[in-house]
Design a protein with these regions (language model features):
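N-terminal phosphate-binding or glycine-rich loops at protein starts, especially the Walker A/P-loop
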Residues: 1-16
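Accessory alpha-helical/coil subdomains and C-terminal extensions
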Residues: 8, 63-66, 71-75, 80-83, ...
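Short, glycine-/Ser/Thr-/acidic-enriched flexible segments
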Residues: 16, 44, 136-137, 188-189, ...
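Glycine-rich oxoanion-binding loops at beta->alpha junctions
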Residues: 17-71, 93, 101-110, 114
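Acidic/polar active-site rim loop that often engages polyanionic ligands
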Residues: 89-102, 124-126
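C-terminal non-catalytic interaction/assembly regions of soluble proteins
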Residues: 190-257
Length: 257
């Protein structure tokens, strides 16, 4: 945008900033390739009436969102009162936006792989059972991909779709190897499982710290490419979401979310 001579402003705290018209001017000195968000985030839903007023004569609004926040961007894009071109950029560690690969997922998988390495060292060195709880309240994609990334170091992967007797499987792994590393989705209730095991289990819960790390090279390149492609597409099209490999109009996002 700046290369085209356009001024760039950022609304702070997600859609809360748009609702309250909290914004700041962006220049090159603001740009940082590290983790986190320069503008910060919130879980506030967009207030369409206030957003229409605060958008004013902005040409384009880039909404860097996960699945829930993208619904606010969608509602903005589909409101007839909004003249601004609404452009969604898929970004979430959970990769749970149907039909769209998002920025951040590969970084989260890579960070989880490091936690699995640590869990493996702890379990195998102390002949113990270690649970690693993977975040994701509505999607277990992180759990399954982390399992694939460190398959040789994991004895059990448990998601809501896992069938069978968890306890028996874990006990078998422990008896066979002398240790067990269990990667389990946050969506699973497992307190009963821990108390029913023959040995006391240890639990590692990295939580959302996995998203507060430097982006991996893949995500850094992906982010740069996605925003450039989104900008180019926005010159002739409006109201769409840019994923890693495709573009989805907001009107289609309405039908599947």
């Amino acid at each position: 945008e700046r290369n085209q001579g356009n001024k760039v402003h950022g609304f702070c705290d997600g859609f809360r900033g748009l609702n309250q018209n909290i914004k700041e001017y962006f220049d090159q000195e603001h740009i940082d390739d590290g983790p986190g968000s320069l503008l910060k985030t919130s879980y506030d839903y967009v207030d369409i009436d206030r957003a229409v007023k605060n958008l004013g004569d902005y040409d384009r609004l880039y909404c860097i969102c996960g699945n829930e926040s993208m619904k606010s961007a969608r509602d903005l894009a589909l409101d007839d009162r909004v003249d601004t071109n609404i452009i969604g950029i898929a970004k979430t560690i959970f990769n749970d936006m149907p039909g769209l690969e998002s920025i951040g997922f590969q970084t989260a998988v890579q960070e989880l792989a490091r936690y699995i390495d640590s869990a493996y060292i702890e379990a195998s060195s102390t002949n113990s059972i270690v649970f690693l709880e993977v975040p994701g309240r509505h999607n277990s994609g992180l759990t399954t991909h982390a399992g694939l990334a460190r398959n040789s170091k994991i004895t059990n992967v448990i998601t809501p779709s896992t069938r069978g007797d968890y306890r028996t499987s874990i006990e078998y792994s422990y008896g066979n190897r002398g240790y067990a590393v269990v990667v389990i989705s946050e969506m699973c209730e497992y307190d009963y499982l821990i108390t029913s095991l023959s040995v006391k289990a240890k639990v590692i819960t990295p939580g959302y710290l996995i998203g507060a790390v430097d982006p991996c090279t893949y995500d850094s390149i992906l982010a740069e490419r996605m925003v450039r492609e989104a900008f180019n597409h926005a010159q002739e099209h409006r109201d769409f979401i840019k994923g890693a490999t495709n573009i989805m109009p907001f009107k289609d996002y309405l039908r599947i979310v």
